[in-house]
Swiss-Prot record:
One of its GO terms (cellular component) is DUBm complex. It comes from the Eukaryota. It comes from Drosophila willistoni. Residues 96-119 have a biased composition (Acidic residues). It holds the Pfam family EnY2. Keywords: Activator, Chromatin regulator, Cytoplasm, mRNA transport, Nucleus, Protein transport, Transcription, Transcription regulation, Translocation, Transport. This is Enhancer of yellow 2 transcription factor. Component of the nuclear pore complex (NPC)-associated AMEX complex (anchoring and mRNA export complex), composed of at least e(y)2 and xmas-2. Component of the SAGA transcription coactivator-HAT complexes, at least composed of Ada2b, e(y)2, Pcaf/Gcn5, Taf10 and Nipped-A/Trrap. Within the SAGA complex, e(y)2, Sgf11, and not/nonstop form an additional subcomplex of SAGA called the DUB module (deubiquitination module). Component of the THO complex, composed of at least e(y)2, HPR1, THO2, THOC5, THOC6 and THOC7. Interacts with e(y)1. Interacts with su(Hw) (via zinc fingers). The lineage of its organism: Eukaryota, Metazoa, Ecdysozoa, Arthropoda, Hexapoda. One of its GO terms (molecular function) is C2H2 zinc finger domain binding. InterPro entries: TF_ENY2 (IPR018783), TF_EnY2_sf (IPR038212). It is found in: Nucleus, Nucleoplasm; Cytoplasm. Residues 93-119 are annotated as: Disordered. Involved in mRNA export coupled transcription activation by association with both the AMEX and the SAGA complexes. The SAGA complex is a multiprotein complex that activates transcription by remodeling chromatin and mediating histone acetylation and deubiquitination. Within the SAGA complex, participates in a subcomplex that specifically deubiquitinates histone H2B. The SAGA complex is recruited to specific gene promoters by activators, where it is required for transcription. Required for nuclear receptor-mediated transactivation.
């Protein structure tokens, strides 16, 4: 399993994925990325229509448009947005790591000096 998959699974389990997704959507809207991608899609559709690639017999499918737009759209994401998201994910993972360590330490506190549990 890749680190990306592990992080994805963790954020889904903790409910943080929706927070991260909302943050990403907000930042992409604020920086104008969504408008740029919308314009990119329009331009591609216009180019295909002018070139005769899109006719009444042969339509560009959504999948084809997504395949063409995705690499370009990813390069348009500002570095500041990428860094902010990465920092947010690291914070979430660090908090989880700290909580896991704190819970483990609490278990050890239940034992007295002789190694027997206090009840």
């Amino acid at each position: 399993m890749t680190v990306s998959n592990t992080v994805d699974q963790y954020t889904v389990l903790t409910g943080d994925r929706s927070k991260i997704k909302d943050l990403l959507c907000n930042r992409l809207t604020e920086c104008g990325w969504r408008d740029e991608v919308r314009l990119l899609c329009r331009n591609i559709l216009m180019e295909k229509a002018v070139a005769g690639a899109v006719t009444s017999n042969s339509n560009l499918t959504l999948e084809q448009l997504i395949t063409e737009v995705t690499p370009k759209a990813r390069t348009l994401v500002p570095d500041a947005v990428k860094k902010e998201l990465l920092m947010k994910i690291r914070t979430i993972l660090t908090e989880n790591e700290t909580e896991g360590t704190d819970n483990h330490d609490d278990d050890e506190d239940d034992e007295d000096e002789n190694g027997t549990e206090d009840n």
